């Protein structure tokens, strides 16, 4: 059971430069996917992608969009590393909008805190031991602080700093953090979700907005809400988009991760965020699409979303 909400609107940027990009390069459109437990409601986009002889959601007719998937690679290349006995931070590819963390400790509850240039703190669980995991740098260019926190009291939710490192980050492409796979949006070129996204994008889609529409409609029509799973989500839960696709069910986090993986592999920058709407914990996504189109006709709902952790 779930309540699905699709809402498009303009996202404010933090700098004059980004506002210029917003006006000149792309339109920032937000897609909120809220999934609650009380009602079964699907707010669908009428019409899906453009069919033969019809205009696309962008209102333009031309050559179909290339549906070929593109999966950007992440790598701990070892060119720039920091760390101690517990952790290795590979910062070789900060220009691509990510760092990689290899935790080698035994603490049962570990977190990674990424402080962006504007002081916003983004906190992610660390559950991979003995291997690298990818974490995004979502705050643009500037000075970041990466901090590893280990639990000292699970009952009291207390943590101690085990490692911290300052990084000067200059991201080559501002959209890069939202195109690469990472800890929460985990996929490869061989993932089933990537193949499915490619198939959906090949169904008479003429624009990025058509692809968003097609994938969104597929997800809300074919994935059902797993109430039992929602009641027993463990600490550090990581969505598996292929598993969600195979089982046809999941929680809001699964919906958002599946759609994010499909869209990123279609070269559409997509940000997954987790946070609270009132007392309800949920996940939603935002994506960048090319300008010139008209957002799908959807039922408008108030934006009650508070700050979230993007990935």
Where are the predicted features?
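N-terminal accessory/pre-domain segments preceding catalytic cores
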Residues: 4, 8-13, 17-209, 295-302
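Alpha-helix capping and helix-loop boundary segments enriched in small/acidic/polar residues
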Residues: 123, 247-250, 273-276
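Aromatic side chains
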Residues: 144, 159, 178, 216-218, ...
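Secondary-structure boundary elements
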Residues: 179-247, 295, 307
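Active-site nucleophilic cysteine motif
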Residues: 211-215, 247-263
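Hydrophobic/aromatic-rich core segments of domains that either
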Residues: 254-311
């Amino acid at each position: 059971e779930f309540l699905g909400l699709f809402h498009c609107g303009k996202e404010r940027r933090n700098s004059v430069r980004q506002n210029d990009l917003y006006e000149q390069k792309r339109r920032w459109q937000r897609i909120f996917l809220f999934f609650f437990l009380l009602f079964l409601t699907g707010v669908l986009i009428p019409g899906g992608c453009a069919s033969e002889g019809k205009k696309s959601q962008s209102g333009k007719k031309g050559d179909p969009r290339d549906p070929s998937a593109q999966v950007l690679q992440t790598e701990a290349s070892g060119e720039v590393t920091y760390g101690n006995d517990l952790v290795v931070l590979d910062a070789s590819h900060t220009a691509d909008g990510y760092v990689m963390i290899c935790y080698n400790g035994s603490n049962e509850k570990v977190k990674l805190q990424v402080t962006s240039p504007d002081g916003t703190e983004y906190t992610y669980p660390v559950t991979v031991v003995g291997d690298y995991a990818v974490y995004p740098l979502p705050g643009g260019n500037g000075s970041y602080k990466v901090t590893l926190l280990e639990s000292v009291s699970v009952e009291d939710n207390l943590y101690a700093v085990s490692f911290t490192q300052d990084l000067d980050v200059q991201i080559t492409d501002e959209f890069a953090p939202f195109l690469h796979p990472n800890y929460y949006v985990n996929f490869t070129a061989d993932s089933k979700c990537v193949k499915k996204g490619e198939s959906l994008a090949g169904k008479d889609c003429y624009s990025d907005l058509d692809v968003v529409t097609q994938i969104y409609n597929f997800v809300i029509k074919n994935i059902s809400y797993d109430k039992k799973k929602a009641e027993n989500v463990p600490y550090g839960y990581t969505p598996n988009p292929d598993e969600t696709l195979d089982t046809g069910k999941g929680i809001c986090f699964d919906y958002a991760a599946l759609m994010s993986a499909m869209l990123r592999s279609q070269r559409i920058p997509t940000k997954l965020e987790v946070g609270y709407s009132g007392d309800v914990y949920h996940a939603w996504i935002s994506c960048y699409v090319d300008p010139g189109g008209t957002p799908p006709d959807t039922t408008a709902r108030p934006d009650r979303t508070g700050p979230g952790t993007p990935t």
